[in-house]
C-alpha cells in the first residue's frame, strides 16, 4: 500500500462510517425519546401521510362519540320531563273521571277544576323551563336538530321534538257537539244509520257506519260508536247532547258526520280543543276531558318512544365508534409508534459501531506519520 501524506483514504473511510453511526445514534435516541418512529417526512413520507389521515379519523371519531353522548343527554333530559308530564296528565284524567260521577255537586266539580287548572299551569311550566345547554326542549322551539355521529361529513342523525305545552294541537283534537240536546226519553224512531268519514293518522280513508235500531237512546248510540272505532270517542252530556272527539294522534283533519241520524241530531262544525281547554266543572266537559287527555297521553307516549329509540340508536352508534376508533388507533400505532425492543437494539448497534469507528479513525490518523520514519 502506498504511503502518502496529502490524502488519508483510511481516515476518510473511518470518518464516513463514524458519521453514519452517529446519525443512527441520533435517530434512535430521537425515536426512543419521542415514542414515534416517524418524526419527520424524511423518516417515511408515505407512512407520515397515512398516519396523519388516521389521526384525523381518530380525532373525528372521538368528537363523534362526544356528540352522540350529548345527544343522549338531551334525550334523557327531555324524556325525564315527559315522564312528569305523563304523571300530570294521568292525574288530570283521574280528576276528570271523578268529576264525571253523578254524586258530585257543582261546588265539588268547581273544586276539582281548580286542581285541573293548577296542573295545566304546571304542564306549561315544565314545557317552558326544560332545557339543555341553553336550548329549550319542550316548548316547540327545538324543532329538528342534527347530531354529527361520524368522523366525516354527511354522517348526521336528526332529532325532532314537538311542543309539550297544554295548548298545542298535538295534545288535543277536534270536538263535535250536537246543536240541540235531546230529552231524557228521546229514542230512535226507526232503524237508521250514522256515518263517520275521516282520514286516519296513516293517511287512510275510513268510514264508520253505525246502524241504530228503533228504540235506541243517545247512550246506546255512544256505546255503538265507541265499540266500532278507537279513532273517534263519543259521550253524552247532562244536557242531552251527543258529543264526539277525534284526537289529533288518530285523525287527520275533520270528521264528516252523515247518515239519517247525523242529519236528525245535527252537529256543529268541529272546533279545536286541547288540554288547555279541559273543563271538568260539568259532566259533558268531564266526559270530553277524558278523551282529550287520552289523546294527550298518546302524544306524550309517542314522543317518549321516539326519544327512547334515539337513545338506543346512539348507544349502539357509540359502541361502533369506539370499536372503529380502537382499530384505527391500532393501525396508526403500527405505522408510527416506536418499537422499543427493535429501537434499543438498533441504538446498541449504533453505539458499538460509533466506538469502533472512533478507534479505527484514531489509528488511521497515525498512518501518515510513517512517512517521517522514511525521511529520518
Swiss-Prot record:
Keyword presence, Secreted: yes
Cellular component annotations (GO), alphabetically ordered: bacterial-type flagellum; extracellular region
Coiled coil: 103-129
A GO MF label: structural molecule activity
UniProt entry keywords in alphabetical sequence: Bacterial flagellum, Coiled coil, Secreted
Location in the cell: Secreted; Bacterial flagellum
Principal subcellular localisation of the protein: secreted
Keyword Secreted (UniProt): yes
Function: Flagellin is the subunit protein which polymerizes to form the filaments of bacterial flagella. FlaB is not essential for flagellar synthesis and motility.
Family: Belongs to the bacterial flagellin family.
Subunit structure: Heteromer of multiple flagellin subunits including FlaA, FlaB, FlaC, FlaD and FlaE.
Other observations noted: V.cholerae is able to differentially regulate the flagellins within the flagellum maybe to produce flagella which are particularly suited for motility within a given environment.
Protein name: Flagellin B
Organism field: Vibrio cholerae serotype O1 (strain ATCC 39315 / El Tor Inaba N16961)
